[in-house]
């Protein structure tokens, strides 16, 4: 299993690998998740790439400290550095996710995600959006009556209700929804959201505490 958190504490990640990954044992963190996502999707690493776990001796034990990326011909390389166990434990100790009851659970399709991207582009000055239900429609809102604004139906015919109107970070949610895999999205009126991405190799839970606008 794996647990990580963005430096600004907007996203907590909990992952379970379906099979043991060689070299990935112990506790470590994944800083700058957007950089890791970019590296994993670079065309140079799509076929026959060599991605290895770098290890080092620390306090008498061998621990992973990063990933080394190298393309098939060995002329394109990158290194991604893990966060140490001590730093991870310090960062995570105050934000342990205790779990909530989910009021809405959906599996967004590519058309809904594309519409989300269009509204985000049209309202690029907005860093957060509000998720609320109107009847059986789950709607996302950008801006408010005092400025430019927009909204759209993200998913129709949902079960449950969201009435509080919590705000969520646009960039982080869009980044997660762009990841490859089967996606499930959950919202709680208590002020939490979780996006689960099943890549086939692992299942990643991206947990987002609500933000005040």
State where each predicted segment sits.
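Short, well-ordered, aromatic-rich surface patches in folded extracellular/luminal domains
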Residues: 81-92, 96
């Amino acid at each position: 299993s794996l647990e990580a958190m963005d430096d600004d504490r907007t996203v907590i990640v909990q992952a379970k690998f379906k099979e043991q990954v060689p070299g990935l044992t112990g506790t470590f963190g994944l800083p700058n998740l957007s950089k890791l996502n970019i590296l994993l999707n670079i065309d140079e690493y799509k076929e026959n790439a060599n991605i290895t776990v770098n290890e080092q001796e620390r306090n008498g034990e061998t621990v992973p400290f990063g990933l080394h990326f190298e393309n098939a011909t060995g002329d394109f390389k990158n290194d991604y550095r893990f966060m140490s166990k001590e730093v991870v434990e310090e960062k995570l100790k105050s934000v342990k996710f205790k779990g909530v009851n989910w009021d809405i659970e959906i599996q967004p399709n590519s058309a809904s995600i594309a519409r989300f991207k269009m509204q985000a582009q049209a309202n690029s000055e907005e860093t957060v959006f509000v998720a609320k239900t109107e009847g059986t429609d789950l709607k996302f809102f950008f801006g408010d009556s005092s400025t430019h604004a927009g909204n759209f139906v993200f998913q129709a015919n949902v079960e449950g209700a969201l009435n509080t109107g919590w705000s969520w970070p646009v960039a982080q949610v869009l980044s997660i929804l762009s990841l490859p895999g089967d996606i499930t999205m959950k919202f709680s009126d208590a002020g939490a959201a979780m996006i689960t991405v099943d890549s086939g190799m692992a299942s990643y839970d991206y947990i987002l505490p609500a933000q005040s606008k």
